[in-house]
C-alpha cells in the first residue's frame, strides 16, 4: 500500500493527507497541494486561511501521516526514520527534507539517494559481486503530455477549453495517470469522464481512446532524453554496457514498454524482473534503517556482510579569483568524506576573505548554484599571496555539508553548516 503525497485543507478546517486528500482534489483544487517535493529547499509557500505553509511543512504533514499509519500497524511508537530523496537533490533540498522529518517528530537517521536504496534492496537478495545500474524514471511529465492530448482532443470535438476549469483538469490529470498505467499492459485505454464540464449551457462528457502507439508518439522525446544520463552514468563509472550485471527499473513509468525497449538499446541488457519498481526504494530504506539499529546486513547465499556507501551527486566548489569555481569535492565521491585545500589572498593586506560555496559542474561560479556564503575575518595583514587560508569541506553520511575556513597563521576560524535557511537568507 502506498500513500499519495497529497495534502488538502477542507473549508471546515480539516486537514486530509494521502488518498483522502487526492479524492477530494476535484471539488477542492485551490486547497489541495501535491508534488511538493519539487519545491523543497526553495522560497515556495502556499497560503491557506491566512497561514503560509512552506514545502517543508507540507512534506512534514505527509510524514506525520506515514508515522501514524506505521504506529497503528506496528503497535508501538515510531521515532526514527530513513528518508529517500532523488539523486539530483542538492544540499539545500536534502537539509529541507531532514527539516521536514524533524517537524513531523522524527529523528532522521539518514538521507539516502533513491537509486542507492533500490540497489540495496536488490543486493540483499543477490549476493554475487556485480555492477548494477538503476534506471529511475518518474512519470509526471508523461502524465502531463497525456493530459495535454486529452484537453486538445476534447476542445477539437466540443469547442470547450478544459484548461480554464480547475475541477475538470484535476479529473483529466487523474484519468491521464490511469491511462498511462493501463497502456503498460494493454494496447489501448478508454477514457470516460461523465459530466466533465459545462459549455454554452450544455453538460459535456469526455469519451476518448488513447492507443499505445499514440502514447509513444506523445512521450517519445521524453524517453529519448534518458539516453544522455544513462551514457553519462556509464562514462562516470568507467564501464561499458557489457560489464553491467543487472539493470534495475525503478518508478511506475518504467513499466511502459517503450521505456523498457529504450533501456535495452542503451544498456544491451534485459531489465531485472524480480523487484517491484514501486516498492524497492522503500524496501532499501527499511533495510538501511535496520542496519543503523545495529543489525548486520548479509547478502543472500553468501554469508558476507554488505556495506552501503552512498555518493555525492554534484561537485562542490568555492569561488576564486576571476569568478572561477574551484572544486574541492568531485561528484560521485563516496560519503562520508572530508577534503581540505590551502588558498591565499589576491589583494595586499586584506583582513578578511569571503567564502562562496557552490554546487554544480560548470567551470564558472555564476553558472553553478550558490548554497552558502560566509566571511572569515581577522586574517593577518600581509602582502598578496602570503596568508595561508585552509578551506575544508566535510560531508556526512546524509550528504549534509559543513564548510570551514581557517587562517593557518592566526588560527582564526569560521564555519557554516549548509541548511535550507542558510541558502535563502
Where are these regions (language model features)?
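Short loop/turn motifs enriched for small/polar and acidic residues
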Residues: 84-88, 177, 194-196, 250-252, ...
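Long alpha-helical scaffolds in large eukaryotic adaptor/regulatory proteins
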Residues: 122, 183-186, 292, 296
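N-terminal phosphate-binding loop and flanking beta/alpha elements of the actin-like ATPase fold
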Residues: 1-4, 9-174, 202-291
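Acidic low-complexity intrinsically disordered segments
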Residues: 1-3, 8-14, 68, 107, ...
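Solvent-exposed beta-strand sheet faces enriched in polar/charged residues
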Residues: 84, 192-194, 250, 274, ...
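Conserved ATP-utilizing enzyme core subdomain
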Residues: 171-198
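Short loop/turn segments at connectors of secondary-structure elements within structured domains
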Residues: 77, 91, 128, 185-187, ...
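Glycine/charge-rich, flexible interdomain linkers and switch-proximal surface loops
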Residues: 119, 164, 168-171, 190-195, ...
Amino acid at each position: 500500500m502506498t500513500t499519495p503525497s497529497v495534502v488538502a485543507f477542507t473549508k471546515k478546517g480539516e486537514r486530509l493527507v494521502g488518498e483522502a486528500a487526492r479524492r477530494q482534489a476535484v471539488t477542492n483544487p485551490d486547497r489541495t497541494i501535491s508534488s511538493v517535493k519539487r519545491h523543497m529547499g526553495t522560497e515556495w509557500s502556499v497560503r491557506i486561511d491566512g497561514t503560509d505553509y512552506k514545502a517543508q511543512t507540507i512534506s512534514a504533514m505527509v510524514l506525520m501521516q506515514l508515522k501514524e499509519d506505521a504506529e497503528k500497524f506496528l503497535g508501538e511508537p515510531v521515532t526514527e526514520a530513513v528518508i529517500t530523496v532523488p539523486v539530483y537533490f542538492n544540499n539545500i533540498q536534502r537539509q529541507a527534507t531532514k527539516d521536514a522529518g524533524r517537524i513531523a517528530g522524527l529523528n532522521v537517521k539518514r538521507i539516502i539517494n533513491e537509486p542507492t536504496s533500490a540497489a540495496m534492496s536488490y543486493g540483499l537478495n543477490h549476493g554475487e559481486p556485480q555492477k548494477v545500474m538503476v534506471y529511475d524514471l518518474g512519470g509526471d511529465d508523461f502524465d502531463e503530455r497525456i493530459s495535454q492530448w486529452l484537453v486538445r482532443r476534447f476542445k477539437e470535438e466540443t469547442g470547450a477549453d478544459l484548461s480554464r476549469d480547475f475541477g475538470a483538469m484535476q479529473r483529466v490529470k487523474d484519468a491521464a495517470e490511469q491511462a498511462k498505467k493501463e497502456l503498460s499492459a494493454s494496447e489501448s485505454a478508454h477514457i470516460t469522464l461523465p459530466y466533465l464540464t459545462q459549455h454554452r449551457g450544455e453538460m459535456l462528457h469526455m469519451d476518448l481512446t488513447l492507443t499505445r502507439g499514440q502514447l509513444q508518439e506523445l512521450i517519445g522525446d521524453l524517453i529519448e532524453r534518458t539516453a544522455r544520463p544513462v551514457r553519462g552514468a556509464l562514462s562516470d563509472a568507467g564501464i561499458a554496457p557489457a560489464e553491467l550485471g543487472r539493470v534495475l527499473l525503478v518508478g511506475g513509468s518504467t513499466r511502459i514498454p517503450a521505456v523498457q525497449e529504450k533501456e535495452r538499446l542503451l544498456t544491451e541488457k534485459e531489465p531485472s524482473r524480480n523487484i517491484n519498481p514501486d516498492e524497492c526504494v522503500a524496501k532499501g530504506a527499511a533495510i538501511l534503517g535496520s542496519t543503523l539499529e545495529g543489525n548486520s546486513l548479509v547478502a543472500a547465499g553468501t554469508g558476507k556482510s554488505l556495506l552501503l556507501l552512498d555518493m555525492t551527486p554534484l561537485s562542490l566548489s568555492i569561488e576564486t579569483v576571476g569568478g572561477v569555481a574551484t572544486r574541492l569535492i568531485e561528484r560521485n565521491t563516496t560519503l562520508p568524506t572530508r577534503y581540505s585545500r590551502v588558498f591565499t589572498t589576491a589583494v595586499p593586506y586584506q583582513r578578511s576573505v569571503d567564502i562562496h560555496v557552490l554546487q554544480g559542474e560548470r567551470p564558472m561560479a555564476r553558472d553553478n548554484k550558490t548554497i552558502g556564503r560566509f566571511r572569515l575575518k581577522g586574517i593577518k595583514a600581509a602582502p598578496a599571496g602570503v596568508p595561508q587560508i585552509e578551506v575544508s569541506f566535510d560531508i556526512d553520511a546524509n550528504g549534509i555539508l559543513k564548510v570551514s575556513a581557517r587562517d593557518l597563521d592566526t588560527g582564526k576560524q569560521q564555519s557554516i553548516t549548509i541548511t535550507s535557511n542558510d541558502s535563502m537568507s
